[in-house]
Amino acid sequence: MYGHHGYPMHAHQQQMVNPTLAIVDNKMHTLSTFLNYIRAYRDPLRISKDLKETFHLFPNLSPFYENIPNRVNLICIKGTIPICFKGINYYLPIIVWVPLNYPQEFPTMVLDPTPEMRIVKNHHHVNLQGLVYHPYISSWSSNSTMETRVSQQQQPQPPQNNISPPPYGSSPTNNNVAAQQQQPPPPYGSSPSTSNSSSYTQPPPSYDSIKNKTNNTSSLPPPKQPQTSPPPPPTQQQQQQQNNNIIPPPQQPSPPPAYTEPTAAKQQQQQTSPSVKPLPPLPPQPVIDKKSEMVDQCTIKLQELLSKFYDTTSLEIKDFEAHNKSLEELSKKKLLEKEELSNQLATYNSQIDQLNENIEQLEKWINENDKSDSNIDIDQILGPKDSLSKQLLKLVSDDSTIEDLLYYLDKALHSNRISLEEYLKNVRSLSRDQFIIRATVKKVQFIIRQNQQQLQQQQQQQNSPQRQQYNQQQYFSK
């Protein structure tokens, strides 16, 4: 396991401090807030439970967030995990991405090397991009846990350095250093020892075969941040207690670690560094409060119910708003129709009043002219009423009379009843009278025609408002 900046650390100095309950609760509070904010995960309770156990088992892991646009919001935990190889412990910086369908889909683990580290080529479990593959993925199920997935990376792996890493804080002899320098590292892809090969005969699947199974978020980790120094390592007793809690992985050949040290100067510096005294043992870890876990679960459940209630209520409110808008439009239409009906009602009432007046006038005239047949004077009834009509009737009758006289005088002349002198004398006199009568008839007709035109104009002026009202009624009815 690599320590700060990838330097190897000795086992007795790898004392990882167990986090207190307050630190774990703080991390879980941050994750719960994030889960309630995005509301995208299928099983947030299972995620909270597994992450809490992971934080207890690996205190160096912490939630990591980064505001990156146009990317799915996924939970990410970042930190270092310890591995032990040949009595030397190393800290490996990793990033773990939790998919949306967890635990149906396995989490994605990516190595996060510092600038001083490099990834070994053709590694069995790590590609050049840092994506980690482990045989535990091939057997992943919904019952698998995240802390077991991370624990698989703690298995001993032989380092692939040009010089074997010395124990941190110790000053080995020159013979040991020379022996270490002369001992070549195991080549990549070399077969493991006989004891290991008997327990794991089938090699793990390649990275290309498992790459298709991972989701899109596994190949797009967020930008890296500077690696922070790990917390103090735990004591040997605490390390042994943690190892007892870890689920043992299946036996397999140990591939080389993903990182190698670029220079040997840092290794010499570690060899010459003085030994560091182990830290005193820490007090026992406090008991986890189950009541707080239940409160957190209840809070998450209530927030889910509130979210569902908010969604359904918002949809109902939108439906009610649309219904209210339609009702307002209908009310406006009803008001317009009511105004039109009131105007039509006023017009019809005025017409009814006018018809009643006409009916009264007709009844009055009928009562006045209701007489018996014996008292009726036909000449008075059928004769003209005004003086001009009477004069015109008399003139027309005189003109017809003169026409008859001229006709009979003409017949008397042909039958030799009268002489020619008498005929001419009578014709001259009657013609003069007929001319005067006809001229008077034309004057009387002209005066009567003028009176009729004036009467028609007066009637038209009286009927024009009624016609306008009638036209308006016809227009609105259309």
Swiss-Prot record:
<dbReference type="GO" id="GO:0140220">
    <property type="term" value="C:pathogen-containing vacuole"/>
</dbReference>
<dbReference type="GO" id="GO:0008333">
    <property type="term" value="P:endosome to lysosome transport"/>
</dbReference>
<dbReference type="InterPro" id="IPR017916">
    <property type="entry name" value="SB_dom"/>
</dbReference>
<keyword id="KW-0539">Nucleus</keyword>
<dbReference type="GO" id="GO:0000813">
    <property type="term" value="C:ESCRT I complex"/>
</dbReference>
<feature type="region of interest" description="Disordered">
    <location>
        <begin position="144"/>
        <end position="290"/>
    </location>
</feature>
<dbReference type="GO" id="GO:0043130">
    <property type="term" value="F:ubiquitin binding"/>
</dbReference>
<feature type="compositionally biased region" description="Low complexity">
    <location>
        <begin position="236"/>
        <end position="246"/>
    </location>
</feature>
<dbReference type="GO" id="GO:0050830">
    <property type="term" value="P:defense response to Gram-positive bacterium"/>
</dbReference>
<dbReference type="GO" id="GO:0005886">
    <property type="term" value="C:plasma membrane"/>
</dbReference>
<feature type="compositionally biased region" description="Polar residues">
    <location>
        <begin position="170"/>
        <end position="179"/>
    </location>
</feature>
<feature type="compositionally biased region" description="Pro residues">
    <location>
        <begin position="277"/>
        <end position="286"/>
    </location>
</feature>
<dbReference type="GO" id="GO:0036211">
    <property type="term" value="P:protein modification process"/>
</dbReference>
<keyword id="KW-0963">Cytoplasm</keyword>
<feature type="domain" description="UEV">
    <location>
        <begin position="24"/>
        <end position="172"/>
    </location>
</feature>
<dbReference type="Pfam" id="PF09454">
    <property type="entry name" value="Vps23_core"/>
</dbReference>
<feature type="compositionally biased region" description="Pro residues">
    <location>
        <begin position="247"/>
        <end position="259"/>
    </location>
</feature>
<dbReference type="GO" id="GO:0031902">
    <property type="term" value="C:late endosome membrane"/>
</dbReference>
<protein>
    <recommendedName>
        <fullName>ESCRT-I complex subunit tsg101</fullName>
    </recommendedName>
</protein>
<feature type="coiled-coil region">
    <location>
        <begin position="321"/>
        <end position="372"/>
    </location>
</feature>
<feature type="compositionally biased region" description="Low complexity">
    <location>
        <begin position="190"/>
        <end position="201"/>
    </location>
</feature>
<dbReference type="GO" id="GO:0015031">
    <property type="term" value="P:protein transport"/>
</dbReference>
<dbReference type="GO" id="GO:0005634">
    <property type="term" value="C:nucleus"/>
</dbReference>
<dbReference type="InterPro" id="IPR008883">
    <property type="entry name" value="UEV_N"/>
</dbReference>
<feature type="domain" description="SB">
    <location>
        <begin position="386"/>
        <end position="454"/>
    </location>
</feature>
<dbReference type="Pfam" id="PF05743">
    <property type="entry name" value="UEV"/>
</dbReference>
<comment type="function">
    <text>Component of the ESCRT-I complex, a regulator of vesicular trafficking process. Required for the sorting of endocytic ubiquitinated cargos into multivesicular bodies. May be involved in cell growth and differentiation. Acts as a negative growth regulator.</text>
</comment>
<dbReference type="InterPro" id="IPR016135">
    <property type="entry name" value="UBQ-conjugating_enzyme/RWD"/>
</dbReference>
<feature type="region of interest" description="Disordered">
    <location>
        <begin position="458"/>
        <end position="478"/>
    </location>
</feature>
<keyword id="KW-0175">Coiled coil</keyword>
<dbReference type="GO" id="GO:0001778">
    <property type="term" value="P:plasma membrane repair"/>
</dbReference>
<dbReference type="GO" id="GO:0009611">
    <property type="term" value="P:response to wounding"/>
</dbReference>
<dbReference type="InterPro" id="IPR052070">
    <property type="entry name" value="ESCRT-I_UEV_domain"/>
</dbReference>
<feature type="compositionally biased region" description="Pro residues">
    <location>
        <begin position="156"/>
        <end position="169"/>
    </location>
</feature>
<dbReference type="InterPro" id="IPR037202">
    <property type="entry name" value="ESCRT_assembly_dom"/>
</dbReference>
<keyword id="KW-0967">Endosome</keyword>
<keyword id="KW-0341">Growth regulation</keyword>
<keyword id="KW-0472">Membrane</keyword>
<keyword id="KW-0813">Transport</keyword>
<comment type="similarity">
    <text>Belongs to the ubiquitin-conjugating enzyme family. UEV subfamily.</text>
</comment>
<comment type="subunit">
    <text>Component of the ESCRT-I complex (endosomal sorting complex required for transport I).</text>
</comment>
<keyword id="KW-0653">Protein transport</keyword>
